[in-house]
């Protein structure tokens, strides 16, 4: 919790410093920006935290995940017992456990906090992974919950949203004034077109930052899964995932929280939420002092 608060404060300080430099260079009076900053923060953080609060509901609805309340099969019983054991070891509340219909080998975790989470696995995972590999995948998802990754991503996304809204309007106003030659006139239609275009451009860079952080947290979740299930099991699970070439059926709003992400080269890698599986496996093999 304290790590997330520190990261949040540090990110805000960095953003404020950068905003101050940008406004100084562009000749913008910070005193005139208070209203815009408040509006941007309300929309930037509001949307991010509403998504976080609704994440469990939306994930279950979009994937059709069925929560296991009373296990009906040995597999469901094993899933509940494994998640319960790992949650206790990680010091978090027991998450809801669900299964969703999907041919790919995948799983995801979501939820507003460490004690109100959801861990779901695909039917494809249950069909193609053995229990050791599945245990490691569950450990990976429990590590996401224990690390508070969903909350941290919401905080980061809120900061980035706010910065995009503010910077697009500041730069858009300057461009509009320079083109029109009249700083005192009201904003015309061209201003809103410029702002929209700038939000697209700045939003692209904000997405790169968010995805960079997402890739970092995947390495941490792999390490957490190795601690909970064993490093050899975690490596075996990732190797199994590398053979999974089926289409990812997870909805876009859930894909960032799955254990298996997309693949890509060049610039496309900057927009991927997951690092390449080869890099994740190499990081685990290079780690020392991890539980086997």
From Swiss-Prot:
The chain crosses the membrane at residues 5-25, 34-54, 155-175, 193-213. HAMAP family: Pept_M48_protease_HtpX (MF_00188). This is Protease HtpX. GO terms for biological process: proteolysis. Its main location: membrane. It holds the Pfam family Peptidase_M48. The keyword Membrane applies. Binds 1 zinc ion per subunit.
């Amino acid at each position: 919790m304290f790590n997330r608060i520190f990261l949040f404060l540090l990110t805000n300080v960095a953003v404020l410093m950068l905003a101050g430099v940008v406004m100084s260079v562009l000749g913008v009076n910070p005193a005139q920006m208070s209203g815009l900053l408040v509006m941007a923060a309300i929309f930037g953080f509001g949307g991010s935290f509403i998504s976080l609060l609704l994440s469990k509901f939306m994930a279950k609805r979009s994937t059709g995940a069925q929560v296991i309340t009373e296990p009906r099969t040995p597999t469901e019983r094993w899933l509940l017992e494994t998640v319960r054991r790992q949650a206790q070891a990680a010091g978090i509340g027991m998450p809801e456990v669900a299964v969703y219909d999907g041919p790919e080998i995948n799983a995801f975790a979501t939820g507003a906090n460490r004690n109100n989470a959801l861990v779901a696995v695909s039917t494809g995972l249950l069909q193609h992974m053995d229990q050791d590999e599945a245990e490691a995948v569950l450990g990976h998802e429990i590590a996401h919950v224990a690390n508070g990754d969903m909350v941290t991503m919401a905080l980061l996304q809120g900061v980035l949203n706010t910065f995009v809204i503010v910077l697009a309007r500041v730069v858009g106003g300057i461009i509009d004034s320079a083109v029109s030659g009249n700083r005192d006139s009201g904003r015309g239609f061209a201003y809103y077109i410029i702002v929209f275009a700038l939000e697209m451009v700045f939003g692209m860079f904000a997405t790169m930052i968010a995805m960079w952080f997402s890739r970092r947290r995947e390495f941490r979740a792999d390490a957490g899964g190795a601690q909970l299930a064993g490093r050899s099991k975690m490596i075996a699970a990732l190797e199994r995932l590398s053979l999974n070439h089926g289409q990812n059926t997870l909805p876009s709003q859930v894909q960032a929280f799955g254990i298996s992400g997309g693949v890509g080269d060049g610039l496309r890698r900057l927009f991927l939420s997951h690092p390449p599986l080869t890099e994740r496996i190499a990081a685990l093999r290079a780690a020392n002092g991890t539980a086997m």
